Structures are given as structure tokens and as C-alpha cells.
Amino acid sequence: MKTYPFLLSISLLLVGASFSCKNDESNGLTPNSNSIELCGVKNPLKNLTWLSTEIQKFGTGESSQRLNGVVLYEYKGANVVEVQCGLCSSTNIHQYKCDGTLYDFTDPNIFQDYIKNRKKIELIFGTEIWK
């Protein structure tokens, strides 16, 4: 009979540990995303209106984080917020300035220079799908 309380204790410990290890998927955010500062704004996924709107297009939940991403790069001394969508083209139309306006990387040579010389700063949301 001594094994029953032991097994029950182990089972409860494992169940408790599995729930405590979850990230903040309930609101669709990457762990620690609330502590990130981007473009001078804390918690940019909620507080940068244009970025919040883009994130809402992804939906919520675990699949949203696996299929989409927001990555902060530095390019020529400026922040570039790259919104990576699993269902979108990986072309040069998803790179934003801090104010939400698109960078003009339509010239293939400029886009290749961006790809070659950008420096990854931080994954802001989800998964970096376009490396």
C-alpha cells in the first residue's frame, strides 16, 4: 500500500509540471514578448497599433506561432520589422519601419543587399520562417 501514495505523488507532480511549462499561447504571444521593447515601445505586439493589426491577421494559438513570425533586424543602422507569414510570399514586401510604413525593397539588388547585410536582433513573435 505504500506504493500507491508514492505513485499518486509522482503523477500529480508530472501533471503540475506539464501545466507550468506552457508559454503564453493563450494570447498568441511568444514567451517574454511582454518584456520586449521595439521602436521605443514596450510590449510592441499590443502597443504598436500597426504591428498588433498584422499579428491579429495570423489568428491565435500554437499553429499561429509555428506558421508565422515577426523578426527584428538591423539594416544600415535602422530597425527593420519583418512580418513573416506562412501563407504569404517570402518576397520583399513584408519589411516595415517603426512607424508601420513599408521599406521599398522592390529592386532585386537592394533586396539582396538587405538579405546579405541585415543583422538579426531578436525574434519578436512566433517562428523565424524565412531565414
Describe these PLM feature segments:
Residues 103-131:
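C-terminal partner/receptor-binding element of secreted or periplasmic proteins
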Residues 49-96:
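Mature extracytoplasmic domains of secretory-pathway proteins
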Residues 27, 45, 91-94, 104:
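Secreted/processed peptides and extracellular or luminal domains of membrane proteins
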Residues 1-19:
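Sec-dependent bacterial lipoprotein signal peptides
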Residues 99-100:
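Residue-level signal for glycine
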Residues 38-40, 50-54, 127-128:
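Hydrophobic protein-protein interaction segments
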Residues 17-41:
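Bacterial Sec-dependent N-terminal signal peptides
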